[in-house]
Each structure stands twice: as C-alpha cells, then as structure tokens.
C-alpha cells in the first residue's frame, strides 16, 4: 500500500494517519442538504471535496460505504410549503431532485446510501427511547430533550465549555427544559404540520437526532469519518456525538471529524441569512460546471475560500489551457497513426498530495506541471524531435495528465465537448464549416472573405488558433 493517508482530525486538532476499523469496508458519513430551497455554491464545497476523498478511499481500500443524508423534515421546509401553499412533499421532492442534478453537474458521484429522515422515523424513535432508558433524555410537555449535563464529553469536538455555552445569550430557554442547554430530540406537531405517532404523542424529530439515527442504521455505531461544513461543528456535530455515544454505551461515534471551510463573498461568509448567496443552479446555467468544481478545489478544504467571478474565470482559463493541451496531444497522436486511447493511471505525485490531508492545491499544481511537460514534448515533436522514441513518451504523458485529472474529477470530457461550452452539435458543425471556409479562402488568396469570417467568428466569441495541424477554434 502507498504512503499513509493522513487527515486532519478536528476531534484532536491534529493531522493523523488514517486507517479504517475494517480495511475491507471503510465508512464515511457526510451531512447532506435540508431540501427546502436551492443549494448555494457554499453548500457545494463539502460534497465536491468529500467526493475527492471518497474516490481516494475507494482506490486505496477497494471499497467504501458512503452515506450522505437528505433532511426532508424541518421547520424551514414547513415554512416554505406554507408560504407557497403546497404540500410539504412538493417542496422536498422538487429540491431533492434539483440537488441531485446540481451535484451531478459538478461531477459529484452519488453516495452509496442517501437516507431520508422521513424514512427512518422508527429508528429515530428507537434511539430516543434508548436515550431515555440510559438516563440521557427526558420527556416534557410532548417534547423529548437531551440532557447535556448527563454527558461528560459534551463540548469535546467544538472545545466549548458547557458552562459558557449555557451562559450564552442565544440559548433558547423553554419552560420545559431542565437546563438551558438541553436540546430537542422530539417535538409535538399540530394538525397542519408533518407528524408521526410516538410514545410521546404525535410529533416529529429534531434535526440532530436524524443524522445520529441514520448514520447508525447504515454505518453502525462507530464510523470512520464524519465530514461536513465547519459551520456544523457546533451545535449539530457536537449534539450528534452526545446522542450517539450515549445511545450506544459510550462507543466512539466518529473516529475522524473533517470540516471544510466556508466560502466568503465580498469578504463575508456566504449564507442565506445574509442574502449574499449564489445558487449552484444559477451558476451552472452561466458557467461550465467543471470550472466551478475546479474553483472549489483551488484552495485547501480547511481554509476559507474567497468566491468571485474572477475565481471562476481563472478556473475557466486554466481548464481551457489543459483541455487545449489534451486536444493537441490527441491530434498529434492521431496524425501519427497512434490514436489508441491512453489509460488513466493516477500519478504518484497527485496521489501523494491527496494523501496529505486532501491537498488539492498541490495536486492541481502537479497537473499544471504535467501539462507543461506535455506541451514541451509536443513542441519538440512538431519541430523535428525523434518521432520513434518521443511519440511513446507523448502517449505516456497524455495518460498521466488524464490520470491526474481523474483523481480530482477533472479533465475527463472530450476536449471538443469542453470547448463547445454545452452548445449543440449543429452549432459546432456550423462553426467548423466557417473555419474550413476561411482556410479555403486564404489558400485562394481571398483575404477579404477570410477576414470577414474571422470577424464574424470573433463577434460570436470564437477564438481561432493556428497550429501545425491546422486551424483550431474554441469559445472565449
């Protein structure tokens, strides 16, 4: 097995060697969306980053049990349904489907398991009953609450002192709570809200218990890696630990905790409450989704990422160069009669970068270096290099570049598809025909016609490139 995989464990605040409890079946749980609205681009950072992690774990161990939940019962969902005058399922079904489509557009591979909270009510009720039986929860006025003071480990993830938390001005002190910091496991539902029968009356679960119950149902009482946004560290993840460990006799809930940093927009955290969001759905309508993925991977996952139009443009330009390199490599090999599709072998340098706490910026710099090597080799061949030996080198570096991209979920499109920017094949054919007409006009010394075509294409945002293999075009 290659060098050890090292991950920053937020539980210990250290980068540590990772090894799963069961090497034949590592487990990963990622907090998923609450489906009441479009996901903003900040919500997509975790799924993209942990998609890279999931692929790395599969390569390393040959298997993975990866769960990412759907929260489909929540007060925000109820409010959205009431505001729009539609059934709750209309809201949740619509936005769950859109979320899956948006993630697919970003190249995020679906998790193995995508549990929905409403499909796990029996497991949630059973876990709450166990917490009551173990002396960690109590019923009051149709509610069930977790007793924070009953768990000595409360605050170990967020490093918050329980007494300081209780003194916080934002703690909601309801009359049925024994202590201000106790949090809801079950709440009563009125007739107009979703609810299920339970030992405590008709009601619905709190948000935190949903993840604990779903993780246990599908991955067991102890999971290898729990991941999510740093904004979920407290109270959500802290409460998950308390519930899960108290329900399972003190068994460690998650061995490693990974948290991705927030996206900032104009210097402020991107959030729905601040109204400074850009939704994934809107962005993928305006930009190539792969450029968004590249941008999300351009900073280390634990660091904040300043999101801007300039960052997206930079990602587009970089991918233009990389796909241009791939296109030129393929064309040169085809011209030489060696157009066998290269294998995609992930370079050791890229794998090593990812095994160092998912260092995607370093992996991207390795990709840039491979592309530079490929361009230099191509230029050498075009300008009189030794074809018999160097063509095999070109084929190898082509495979290396594709493999490097594969590790990050990048560079797997046909270059023509990338440069088409999602336009239809008919328009591509029209542009290609104009480019060929311009070449014919130049050969016939009809420079007026050739210049007119170039001007027309430029107005359409088409850039022409003269290469030894002929004129190629791309969209600006």
From Swiss-Prot:
Main location: cytoplasm
Top-level taxon of the source organism: Bacteria
Reaction(s) the record says it catalyses: tRNA(Cys) + L-cysteine + ATP = L-cysteinyl-tRNA(Cys) + AMP + diphosphate
Gene3D superfamilies, per the entry: Cysteine-tRNA ligase, C-terminal anti-codon recognition domain (1.20.120.1910), HUPs (3.40.50.620)
Protein location: Cytoplasm
Enzyme Commission (EC) number: 6.1.1.16
Binding site for Zn(2+): 31, 211, 236, 240
One annotated Gene Ontology cellular component of this protein: cytosol
GO biological process assignments: cysteinyl-tRNA aminoacylation
Record keywords: Aminoacyl-tRNA synthetase, ATP-binding, Cytoplasm, Ligase, Metal-binding, Nucleotide-binding, Protein biosynthesis, Zinc
Binding annotation for ATP: 272
Span of the annotated motif 'HIGH' region: 33-43
Cofactor comment text: Binds 1 zinc ion per subunit.
Motif ('KMSKS' region): 269-273
Cofactor names: Zn(2+)
Gene Ontology MF term list: ATP binding; cysteine-tRNA ligase activity; zinc ion binding
Family: Belongs to the class-I aminoacyl-tRNA synthetase family.
Listed PANTHER family: CYSTEINE--TRNA LIGASE, CYTOPLASMIC, CYSTEINYL-TRNA SYNTHETASE
Assembly: Monomer.
HAMAP family the UniProt entry points to: Cys_tRNA_synth
Name under which the protein is recorded: Cysteine--tRNA ligase
Species: Xanthomonas axonopodis pv. citri (strain 306)
Gene encoding the protein: cysS
